[in-house]
Amino acid sequence: KFMGEEELSKLQKIKLISDYISQTQSEIIKHNSNIDIVSDIKVNGRNLTNIGLFRKYTENYLLSNKLINNEMTVMCRQLTPTSQGVPLEIYAFITDKEWKNYENIVSDLFDHLLASLSTFDLELFELPSKININ
């Protein structure tokens, strides 16, 4: 979804994306002012979106973690949408090569990211089961 001023103001308080929001908003305002659009209709110009901001937050969150090897690929990318939603794929390499530690680190990273979804007005898709339907 396109982000409004109130939502951007709230998200700008998140340290890991505050500079990105400021810089990108400045670029968007400049871009949109150079084209003849009705600015109150978001689809007429460039705008920040909740999933785009979550992708950037995810990447910056990984880069800020000392357990991630920043000298190797660190990336969060959007895959082709499906009937189950818009999948995101994360590439990152952990500095600790011990398997148990690796699994704990990855679990902690995903715990945080999954808990952060609602901040960006996003939800995790789960297939319904018999428990959900009853």
Give the location of each predicted region.
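Structured, soluble regulatory/oligomerization domains located on the cytosolic or IMS-facing side
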Residues: 1-134
